Amino acid sequence: MLPSLQSLTKKVLAGQCVPTNQHYLLKCYDLWWHDGPITFDHNLKLIKSAGIKEGLDLNTALVKAVRENNYNLIKLFAEWGANINYGLVSVNTEHTRDLCRELGAKETLNEEEILQIFIDLKFHKTSSNIILCHEVFSNNPILQKVNNIKMRIEIFWELRELIEKTDLLNNEFSLSALLLKYWYAIAIRYNLKEAIQYFYQKYTHLNTWRLTCALCFNNVFDLHEAYEKDKIHMDIEEMMRIACIKDHNLSTMYYCYVLGANINQAMLTSIQYYNIENMFFCMDLGADAFEEGTIALGEGYKLIKNILSLKIYSPATTPLPKSTDPEIIDHALKNYVSKNMMIFLTYDLR
């Protein structure tokens, strides 16, 4: 779609730093959205306004404008280069659908096009974007055109640690319910604070899911927020087990350790999941489940059995601070190098 001279002028204006006392000009040119001026980052191709501080890419901004039936912005974003077909995933009135057609949209989207739009829209990991994705795709009949297995593959890939090592999603037959958990998990994985609070306030029945995701994705900040402030609790040994699911989860493992979780059991769990860095971290904290770990492995796993067979390990001599303050934990473990891992790596095995 060829842009008009007026839309090009607006695009240039949106890229300028307009003083507050001249914001009335932006209102006159319809460069106003969610109680604030629209700005356009020409380098990143991001649309921003008061309610979308992190920004949305042009296609995603179009999806939002279509969902809100904001005709002026639909036309503007389309002229600025947004793909008008993206608007078809969020269209909710015939008038808006007609407008999209006038601007060049197809009659309908096929399965591959819908799936590609879904993949594209969820790419940017910001609070604004994840909340919008949830609002657009929740109970959206357009997803009925997409093969259920293909959709689940897209979702499961980013949640593979939880899928492979827990049964938390095994009985989630509803795609809408699965998508809700997916968006919530992504918010926690990338520590999107506004999105986390949005889901927490709106879906209190998923409190345990929030705690689980914080543990699995090593988000010690949200773990502390959920556990201490919001009083979302579960058995401490189960918390440690979930923290051990994914390797390098030192922060959430340490949080559970300070709360009183059994460090020998954590070592066993790490061994069973073949998470070597987690295992060495447990040794640093005083775990000594070498014999039990070897037995738990069964056949195979030669490397880890060799590690466990050596009598060269001992607890770290420099103790970590006994605190559940996430700032302290994050600072202490940001560049952590396991003492026992270094002992093994420098040990002469000949």
Curated annotation (Swiss-Prot):
InterPro entries: ASFV_MGF360
Biological-process GO terms, alphabetical: taxis
Top-level taxon of the source organism: Viruses
Transmembrane segments: none
This protein's record includes keyword Coiled coil: no
ANK repeat ranges per the UniProt record: 57-89
Keywords assigned: ANK repeat
Signal sequence region: none
Role according to the record: Plays a role in virus cell tropism, and may be required for efficient virus replication in macrophages.
Family: Belongs to the asfivirus MGF 360 family.
Protein name: Protein MGF 360-12L
Species: African swine fever virus (isolate Warthog/Namibia/Wart80/1980)
